[in-house]
Curated annotation (Swiss-Prot):
The keyword Transmembrane helix applies. This is Uncharacterized protein RP268. It is found in: Cell membrane. It is a multi-pass membrane protein. It comes from Rickettsia prowazekii (strain Madrid E). Belongs to the CcmB/CycW/HelB family.
Length: 215
């Protein structure tokens, strides 16, 4: 348990200070907010602003799939970690760190959404819950994508583009939740996560375990 906590702490520092996930998500989203406010009418912003915010946040996260394991491989720390702890712990720590970073970034942008999109607190709460659920799945898929690119090493830049189609069902659910306040759809999102998460973890762990042919 102590090893896992240390791993999570290490990964959080890595993703926050080196990869700057939190800062990038906030800046990317602020750019989106400014562009949306300048280009669209107030009616369009109130109608489509939240759902476009979901897509914007996901795009900003998916872009990190190419560098998730980059520093670990380049400095040899991944090989060292594999000789000390299990690949499952490495993958779980990576997932938790990314998920925490994205959640913190989401919390930072909520006040901006509240001010610029003129939403009531209930809509903001539904937005947070639904996006938080999507971040659970997207964080695991980003780790999986990074594992694939780390394992094959060449001609894998396209892998990140396959993440978004897997998130489309949850994006649709989020749109319906925000439009109709249908909280029951959250349980469907939970079910989708429970299906994809174990598969994503198992595949990621397998790829990382065999990257140096360590058994």
């Amino acid at each position: 348990m102590n090893n896992l906590f240390v791993l999570i702490k290490r990964e959080f520092i890595l993703q926050h200070r080196i990869n700057n996930i939190i800062k990038y998500i906030v800046i990317f989203f602020l750019f989106y907010i400014i562009s949306t406010v300048l280009i669209n009418s107030e009616k369009d912003i109130n109608k489509f602003g939240l759902i476009f915010s979901v897509i914007c946040l996901l795009i900003s996260l998916i872009s990190f799939s190419t560098i998730i394991f980059k520093s670990d491989v380049e400095d040899g720390s991944l090989e060292l970690l594999l000789s000390i702890v299990s690949c499952e712990k490495i993958i779980f720590a990576k997932f938790v760190a990314i998920f925490i970073c994205t959640t913190v970034g989401l919390i930072f942008v909520l006040p901006v959404i509240y001010v610029f999109f003129d939403q009531i607190l209930l809509e903001i709460a539904l937005f947070f819950i639904s996006v938080w659920m999507i971040f659970v799945l997207s964080s695991s898929l980003v780790v999986l994508s990074g594992s694939v690119q780390c394992y094959f090493k060449k001609n894998t830049n396209f892998v990140g583009t396959f993440i978004m189609p897997l998130l489309i069902p949850n994006i649709i659910m989020t749109g319906l939740i925000l439009q109709d306040n249908n909280l029951q759809l959250i349980f469907i999102m939970i079910g989708i996560n429970l299906i994809f998460l174990p598969v994503s973890f198992c595949l990621s762990a397998y790829l990382i375990k065999n990257i140096y042919n360590i058994t």
